[in-house]
Amino acid sequence: LLGPSISWFYNWGNTVIESVDAALIQSYDVDYCPMVWNGNYNEANIRAYVANHPECKYLLGFNEPNLTDQANMTPEQAAALWPNVKQLADELGLKLVSPALNYGTLAGYNDPIKWLDEFIALVPDNGIEVIALHCYMGGAGGMKSFIEMFRKYGKPIWLTEFCPWNGSGESVNSQIAYMSAALPYLEKDPLVERYAWFIPRYYGYPYMALISEYELSDVGKVFVNMTTMDQ
């Protein structure tokens, strides 16, 4: 359903889920990006996927390391593991995407800039070519300001999770209004290279899902009809 309207995807994993994801690659030539979600990634799966899909271009870094219920890593912990991630990417000819950052819950690291600055200082030879961000602010203006904070790194931005989500009061209409304001900005700002709406399929998120019960949701219909928006 989404295949004609997207150019890439990921699934927070090291490889595709054949029963769910394979058709996107085979039928629509969509670019899949494996991820090292935390330090406990399956290197063999990544190597096998890239061997079978030489068109693979990127390796995504740790998922929200400054959130305690996600990768939950201090800059020091992430930096200690990063040389192995870089070596893997180098051997496979993949471009490295930074750990994906949002405002966090890890003590001392609510500020994603603080986390990233410390991480980069610890691993200056990090090979990062793209900065990944997550943003759940309620308005497109706040999202734009958040992205602008990371312009100083001089690298393309991938917004790999975004939607308006404050824990209460969400509605289909608020998701559509936000999307209608956010996507034109994301498409036009040359700083933003790729983006991925949260969430494509219904996993207990009734308002923001693009697909529900095997058909496009109302939000999904807006997304599909806006996407010449194909980043």
Pin down the residues of each PLM region.
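Aromatic-rich peripheral "rim/lid" segments of glycoside hydrolase catalytic domains that contact
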Residues: 23-34, 38, 169, 185-231
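Loop/turn elements at helix/coil->beta-strand transitions in domains of secreted/extracellular proteins
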Residues: 3-8, 28-32, 54-58, 90-97, ...
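N-terminal carbohydrate-binding/catalytic regions of secreted carbohydrate-active enzymes
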Residues: 1-59, 84
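Active-site clefts of carbohydrate-active enzymes
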Residues: 34, 97-108, 152-181, 198-213
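Active-site-adjacent beta->alpha loops and helix N-cap segments on the catalytic face
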Residues: 14-21, 74, 141-146
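Active-site groove signature of glycoside hydrolases
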Residues: 53-75, 95-106, 126-135, 159, ...
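Aromatic- and acid-rich polysaccharide-binding/catalytic face
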Residues: 11, 34, 57, 63, ...
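An active-site-proximal structural segment forming one wall of the substrate-binding cleft
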Residues: 37-61, 71-91, 110-128, 176-189
